[in-house]
């Protein structure tokens, strides 16, 4: 059974997950590895990776998912904010909405991913203003926590998710 690993990665986090999948799956069965592309549609099973934008997969990934029909799909992604299972499930549910009903989701995985330093700088600039949102300290703390992700534990959990 052929497979493709299709991913969109703005900061390299999702690319790291895609590379981990590529290392774990049989190389001879892989017909495509890379950014969303029609060439991947030849595969029976698609591992589709994304970065989170406004609570769902990025636009390129959502457009690609809409092209899938009768495929087995494993979704994987990263999100800079949060590390809670309910938050990740909400993102995955919003992403699954792009899939046609003829597809079968065979699994999914999400983890936190590091964000560009410009995000922290924006939070710090906001905090310097007299009237700022009250949760900026929590946002900065989350940014700092995300710096090590995806980490070795995340990659191991991904490996387990595809077994």
Which residues does each PLM region occupy?
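Short, conserved, surface-exposed binding loops centered on an aromatic residue
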Residues: 36-40, 64-67
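The conserved SAM/SAH-binding core of class I Rossmann-like methyltransferase domains
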Residues: 6, 33, 76
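N-terminal beta-loop-helix "entrance" segment that forms/cooperates
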Residues: 15, 19, 37-52
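A short, well-structured beta->alpha microelement
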Residues: 26-39
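Structured loop/turn residues at beta-strand edges in well-structured enzyme cores
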Residues: 1, 41, 103
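FMN-binding flavodoxin-like domain, especially the glycine-rich phosphate-binding loop
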Residues: 24-29, 45-48, 53-163
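N-terminal beta1-alpha1 ligand-phosphate binding loop
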Residues: 2-24
